[in-house]
Amino acid sequence: MPELSPKIVGLMSTKLDDGLGMFEFLIGSNEEVLLSYKSVRDRLIVTNKKLLIIDVQGVTGRKKEYMVLPYSKLTGFSCESAGTFDMDAELKVWASAINQVEFQFLKGTD
């Protein structure tokens, strides 16, 4: 299996139900969306059970790749806050069978 290292940049907070139709089928009945972030095309959804990454591809945006990372499969993480001259903060997570996934949040994002 090839090692994956996806990187989602330019994330900013959105309403919890923003784009719900795009990922609702991946949310379980006893699962709650806690945080929602969106870049120009991609999304990061944080639930009480997993991280859900949506990578929108292609010119029309019809092609989407969904990556689900259950918390039970995470093996490590790293956080870097935005500094005086930095425009973003970073969160890196490592999971079983995945090298790392990196998220870059715009400065001022909660």
Predicted feature descriptions by range:
Residues 1-45, 108:
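Anionic N-terminal interaction surfaces
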Residues 26-43, 47-100:
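Phosphoinositide-binding peripheral membrane targeting modules
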Residues 3, 92-110:
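Low-complexity intrinsically disordered segments
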